[in-house]
Regions:
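C-terminal nucleotide
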Residues: 1-57, 82, 86, 90, ...
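Glycine/serine-rich anion-binding loops at beta->alpha junctions
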Residues: 54-58, 62-69, 166-181, 391-409
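Structural signature of FAD isoalloxazine-binding scaffolds in flavoprotein oxidoreductases
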Residues: 71-89, 227
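DPxDG-like acidic metal-binding loop motif
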Residues: 76-79, 173-193, 407-410
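Glycine- and acidic-rich phosphate- and metal-coordinating loops
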Residues: 146-169
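Phosphate-handling active-site elements
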Residues: 152-159, 187-201, 412-425
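Alpha/beta catalytic cores of group-transfer enzymes, especially the acyltransferase/condensing modules
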Residues: 193-242, 351, 377-383, 387, ...
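Single conserved hydrophobic/aromatic residue that forms the stacking wall/gate
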Residues: 429-440
Length: 440
């Protein structure tokens, strides 16, 4: 049984090092885990527990390509969500893994979750229907993941959980995808002997977000959180995407991933995200395709006038972004795996430039007074230097965009100064590619 004494004495330090990479994080993480255990006990009483972790993600390349069956280069990051969990036995929930027998009682068949200081949510295993009044709520995600497990023929079960997160909400590190992955990982390990694949958990999470949470999204966020590390994903077959973990470490080249929160939030940007997908799909529809994958730049240029008249300028810009970005991902992977860090950085910078000019997901046209991402990129470029020189690194928007976080790949010896510069307007997290969602 994991206890506060075991954690404080260093009994899980090796696991924590695997999860968080940076040994300077050990003391903080020990305290964090102990606090989570104590909070769980306050809520649900003494007893044996599981602990689970699911990381946030950073998109390295492939901005808004996943929903068009494109390619993505992404990494899970060492900012995560952890859950202290105890299974609750009922007729529907029979554990196949571990020494925990769970407990029966009035809450059998009910998932109970407290997240940090938020009120408890409760989800019945027998009530997993979509409810539009629950859109954009945590309860909707839990219901969606539970329903997804049932639809795929996996077992589901009730549990009590206390969850605490270091993944900033609404900041672009995919807190919702990390949460979906966490719930899926709990159901997999407690009720399916840990045999539900990371890919299945990701697909279930995407379904939960699209159908139950009411937010259109591709599969990149969930796949990166669930599979972990640095990963190349090709969504050409969205039912069975190609997923390759890359044996690459940016740190070996003397660079760090830096995630900067520009303080804006993704919470009110659903329409902006939906517009990108709808406009890309409109251009694809012109060619009698559902998505842009397979459509070439020549196709766009040969039909430029009619596309412009039918759909307007921005649709063309966004379609061209997808076509070029999709090719760029493949080139980024090749540059990384061959050790050509200069070419990789050039491509990352080019990706950010395309997102700014063509994809146009740096700020919302509904709120032009607030442009935190634009300011973050400006400050980064001033410090990092001319993008053609890469004096200290490169930067780009990542993820959904419009608000939240930016990504910078910064020389290790420049990270502290970059932090000091960015902390004037933002909050910077130094990160590394982390492990997949797992039981601790």
């Amino acid at each position: 049984m994991i206890s506060s004494d075991i954690i404080s004495s260093g009994g899980i330090d090796n696991i924590l090092k695997d999860l968080y990479i940076d040994e300077s994080q050990l003391e903080y993480q020990r305290k964090r885990y102990i606090n989570a255990l104590n909070r769980f006990t306050q809520l649900y009483g003494e007893g044996d527990v599981f602990i689970f972790s699911a990381p946030g993600r950073s998109e390295i390349g492939g901005n808004h390509t996943d929903h068009q069956n494109g390619k993505v280069l992404a990494a899970s990051v060492n900012l995560d969500i952890i859950a202290v969990v105890r299974p609750v036995n009922s007729k529907e929930s029979v554990s196949e893994e571990g020494s925990l027998s769970g407990h029966s009682g009035v809450n059998a068949g009910i998932i109970r979750i407290v997240s940090d200081d938020y009120p408890m949510i409760q989800v019945s295993l027998s009530d997993t229907d979509i409810n539009k009044e629950e859109y954009s709520t945590t309860k909707a995600l839990v219901k969606g993941v539970t329903a997804g497990f049932k639809k795929k023929g996996f077992k589901t079960g009730a549990f009590d959980a206390f969850i605490t997160s270091d993944v900033p909400m609404g900041a672009g590190l995919s807190s919702s995808a990390a949460f979906e992955t966490l719930i899926g990982t709990i159901q997999s390990h407690i009720y399916n002997a840990g045999k539900v694949s990371a890919e299945d958990i990701a697909v279930i999470g995407q379904m939960a977000e699209n159908e139950y949470f009411g937010k259109p999204c591709g599969l990149m966020d969930q796949m990166a959180c669930s599979v972990g590390n640095m990963v190349y994903i090709d969504f050409n077959n969205k039912e069975n995407p190609v997923v390759n973990k890359l044996d690459v470490d940016i740190k070996k080249f003397g660079y760090s991933l830096c995630i900067t929160d520009t303080k804006g939030s993704h919470k009110d940007l659903t329409d902006d995200y939906a517009d990108i997908r709808q406009e890309m799909n409109a251009v694809a529809g012109y060619f009698r395709q559902e998505v842009l994958r397979g459509i070439t730049l020549k196709d766009i240029l040969d039909n430029f006038k009619e596309l412009q008249e039918k759909f307007g300028d921005r649709c063309i810009l966004r379609a061209v972004h997808f076509i070029e970005e999709n090719e760029r991902v493949e080139n980024e992977v090749n540059a990384l795996t061959s050790g050509n860090i200069d070419e990789f950085l050039r491509l990352v910078s080019k990706s950010g430039d395309s997102s700014y000019k063509y994809l146009q997901n740096i700020y919302s046209t509904k709120d032009t007074a607030n442009q935190g991402v634009s300011l973050g990129l400006m400050m980064s470029e001033i410090f990092l230097g001319d993008n053609s020189v890469y004096s200290n690194g490169v930067c780009r928007v990542h993820g959904g965009g419009f608000a939240g976080t930016i990504l910078a790949i910064v020389k290790d010896n420049a990270v502290d100064e970059y932090r000091r510069n960015m902390d004037k307007i933002c909050l910077l997290y130094t990160s590394d590619a982390a492990d997949e969602a797992r039981s601790v």
